[in-house]
A protein has these predicted regions:
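N-terminal pro-sequences and low-complexity stem/linker regions of secreted or lumenal proteins
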Residues: 45-483
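N-terminal secretory signal peptides that target proteins for export/translocation
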Residues: 1-22
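Secretory targeting and sorting signals
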Residues: 16-46
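Short amphipathic alpha-helical "recognition" segments used for binding
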Residues: 11-13, 23-26, 365, 370
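Basic side chains
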Residues: 2, 22-26, 75, 404
Length: 483
């Protein structure tokens, strides 16, 4: 059962202290730091003492679902792409525009010197990827991710796949580097679990993976999470939302979202129309092209078709296959296509009439198996549902984040050319939405997650006039797939 709304069991902190600071103080009492840099939960965190609980609301004096009148942000746009680590995309950023970015270590000649051991005693240095297809797949399964993290040593990547040590730079990703050098970049945004796409996206939609550790389409038929999803709260408290779909909606990875809210799914073309007209809903999930999701009878594909009245995009009607045109940034895809998609979405928001009232968060679901050097912190368990581990799975729980990923907040109120070192994960998006519309927390994780306050400065509208960003590299649809 949920905690009674408004119930507080936190530390006695003055009300004037910002929520982000309060959470940091609480978490400091609940964690300790090991010599390796891996943050480990203490008994206090294990018993959830001094933590906000599911059902907690941030403002007991404001109606549930009522927008915060103090905030100029009335629209949140979420653009979550696929499978890249911070260092793979932004390891070179300290030498290419943002010296405060926590990227690679460099020698006196400016060359990155981060490395990982290889079998046989040699070491693999990080190296520049010389073509736009980002494969081969480096390995982001539950077991591989735990091996890569290796207790916080972050030295297991190359042994699994040497190509995991590759990186891109500003010449490859001019638009992404322009985003990071213009707005506020997260130095400490971690995926929510050391696992693949499905569990990490469940955290974005429900604050928990509730047992899932892998990308398995059969999990679509799992029961809904115990406290529902943020989409259920949108419906209950009259917060408007849409999932703007190119071919497949990732929000439907929790099947109850599509089953319970079919009218909130619409086409990607409608996003651009709504952004231009100033008719975006309160919350928008903007989906790039997946390009593959199984076979022609995929259950998610069939549900999408039914929910959209048989009018799903042509890509969904076709038998599914890896497409040269996929723009979700999945490894093996042409990174120029993903960059072009994000550029279109960001520019649509910036040129629309609601720019001054919109917050866009661009981020990645997980690291795709690619190297990152920052030790992974411990995390608050979202609930009492453990991972559904098989006989060969490495023991572990949801009390640890996954590998660090890129994240930038784009807003007229974003701090200019800044970084935040606050620890965030995907439930920080949930926390920000809960903060803006005073929604009950779904799990312990989102109840205690840092929101997006540290990216923003509401004292100064830094970008009242939208900035001009670098154009993405043009893509010639280079074939990145052979199947």
């Amino acid at each position: 059962m949920r905690t009674r709304l408004g119930q507080r069991e936190d530390l006695a902190l003055p009300a004037r202290i910002p929520q982000t600071v309060k959470r940091a103080i609480r978490l400091a009492t609940a964690t300790s730091v090991l010599g390796l840099g891996l943050v480990a939960p203490t008994a206090l965190a294990g018993t959830t003492a001094h933590l906000e609980k599911p059902g907690w609301v941030r403002d007991s004096h404001r109606a549930l679902g009522a927008h915060d009148p103090r905030s100029p942000i009335t629209h949140v746009v979420i653009v979550m792409q696929e499978n890249h680590s911070f260092d793979e995309y932004f390891g070179m950023l300290p030498r290419e525009g943002q010296p405060k970015a926590d990227g690679f270590t460099f020698d006196s000649a400016g060359r990155p010197i981060n490395s990982n051991p290889l079998p046989g005693g040699k070491r693999q240095l990080v190296f520049h990827q010389d073509q736009p297809c980002s494969g081969p797949e480096a390995g982001q399964s539950w077991n591989n991710t735990h091996k890569e993290i290796d207790g916080g040593r972050m030295d297991g990547f190359a042994a699994i796949e040497p190509h995991s040590m590759s990186y891109y730079d500003k010449s490859d990703l001019p638009f992404y580097y322009s985003l990071a050098n213009t707005f506020t970049l997260a130095n400490r945004w971690f995926s929510s679990a050391p696992a693949q796409t499905y569990p990490n996206r469940r955290f974005l939609y429900a604050g928990t993976a509730y047992g899932n550790i892998s990308t398995d389409t059969s999990s679509y038929f799992d029961a809904p999470p115990p406290h529902g999803t943020i989409m259920d709260e949108f419906a209950k408290y009259n917060v408007s939302w849409h999932d703007y779909v190119t071919d497949l909606p990732d929000t439907a990875l929790i099947g109850s979202n599509l089953e319970n809210h079919p009218s909130d799914y619409t086409s990607i073309a409608q996003f651009y129309a709504d952004a231009k007209l100033g008719t975006l809903p309160d919350v928008s999930y903007v989906e790039s092209e997946d390009g593959a999701a199984g076979i022609a009878t995929d259950p998610v594909r069939d549900q999408v078709g039914a929910a959209m009245g048989g009018s799903e995009p042509q890509q969904v009607k076709n038998a599914f296959y890896w497409s040269d045109g996929t723009d979700e940034d999945e490894e093996d895809s042409d990174v120029r296509l993903g960059q072009a998609f994000v550029s279109r979405v960001v520019n649509a928001v910036m040129s629309g009439p609601d720019w001054q009232h919109t917050l866009l968060i661009w981020l990645y679901d997980e690291h795709g198996g690619f190297y990152d050097h920052v030790a992974v912190p411990s995390a608050i368990k979202p609930d009492n549902i453990p991972p559904a581990l098989g006989p060969g799975d490495i023991k572990g729980g949801y009390d640890m984040y996954g590998v660090r990923v890129p994240a930038v907040v784009v807003s007229a109120w974003s701090k200019k050319h800044a970084v935040t070192n606050v620890v965030h994960d995907h439930t920080s998006v949930v926390a920000e939405i809960e903060e803006l519309w005073n929604l009950p927390a779904l799990t312990y994780r989102d109840a205690n997650a840092a929101d997006l306050s540290d990216f923003l400065d509401f004292r100064h509208e830094t970008f009242a006039a939208p900035p001009t960003l670098a154009a993405p590299n043009s893509a010639d649809l280079t074939s990145c797939h052979t199947t």
